[in-house]
């Protein structure tokens, strides 16, 4: 491993390995186009090709016969069997097969490519398949869905790992396996609850011998063991069956219980759906002993048209001193129909068993997403040591099931996120990597203060691009913003052509895992436009469409509108860890997660670039600091 001693961050753009920072512009002046330029629009790409030809630059351009068509083509999509995939992905898999998307001789991946895809500082098991953290006696515990016998979701057990800092993890033996009639087809999602006497209990969904979903109870076999290595399933299991009117397979994921003083009972919420109106619902149960439960008659919340809710979370994010009505609660649900996590802010009345959104227009399942990319089944816990709310989500693969089998592993967890209320807007949460992640930083390089002209690309001279923490903020020319007259209400990350769709004030941002020729790159960018009301709107997007030459992948353009207040610079923190890229935008008002599987832009062939594809403004990069990130391998736990 390289030295982790952090070097001083230089005040000016640094020069590494003998390569100076280069800005490549469209047009004359003797400037040459080089790395990453294929992201730019039709006119710019034509000039790129011509300039390379005239100046006889030796870069291998690859297949650039129609680069714009390549970048703007419809996304290649697929679905992995029994994985967390959207319905549109399932249809896309059939389309890919029909079109002969996979190589005729089998997998297009070399062992070197597959090895590169494995992450360095994210939580990932040694092998096989991945899917509520808690804090107990000085350690963070993470129980996760795990298939010891394969890389697909089947016969799920509970893996177990511990950490002292949420970064460096140690594997423990499997906590629970499907060995009873009520969980023989899987020990599904659940939660841990700490009781006042220090006892920990687990509530989990068992997938029974008839595939009915029932709720079950487990407790530590040795409560004095701080590692909680062995668990005993309660003889009264199952402790909760699906109630009348609820489908046997639509009743899962009990959240961590909390004590309610209004009637001195413990409460938990279970996700389900109501076929009347295709509504997602949150069912609340109360108990005094965790063995006998009473269903509270009306759901704590219900939203028509959203379908099955799972992995529900409800927690206070802000509170006043006068009355409970001042407390703002987050309700979050993983919407099974779409495989996306949604949240909303609202008020929770415990006595009435009712959560009410502050804004019905942004209710659960129809408004704000926890993450706009590949991210699902997030759960949170309260960290009593640092007095913070921490959320963690599952990040699946977007390659094929056959590739997962070839790799021997599938999926991982995103970086743990601290969650707070955005006090500036009070309409959204802020999610930010937990501070412990910063301990992995080393060798910072500072490129702040550069200006990117229209249609220009700058290649950053970095030593490696596989594991990075990038802090960036941008500001447009004020006169260009003032000159923006025409309203553009049609721009949307997913439907507007990605990074090649040029406007007066966008797109501009970063290219991750890019090749010299531009044959591969993930574009991470802002796009500003004017609405019909004359107000400016800002979208932040990940354009995955050019991220790999492989045809078997799900490659989309994802993102949405992000709130930007007057005077704020456009900022993003981008965590790069091989095949996962996570963006935290405007201080965490929005997050976007992508999986990328380049075939060429790996090892020394990968690049990171800054680009400006806006037609009407230069972009000032007020801050651009790139930290290399050390690995945090997961080790087996060994007693001292």
Predicted segments, located by residue:
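Beta-rich accessory regions
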Residues: 32-38, 51-58, 72-87, 91, ...
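Surface loop/turn signatures of beta-propeller and other carbohydrate-active proteins
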Residues: 87-132, 150-152, 167-194, 225-260, ...
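Entry beta-strands of beta-propeller and related beta-repeat scaffolds
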Residues: 139-142, 198-203, 263-268, 323-330, ...
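Short consensus segments that form the blades of beta-propeller domains
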Residues: 148-154, 207-211, 246-247, 273-276, ...
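Structural motif
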Residues: 153-159, 210-220, 277-283, 338-345, ...
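Carboxylate/His-rich catalytic cores and anion/metal-binding grooves
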Residues: 199-242
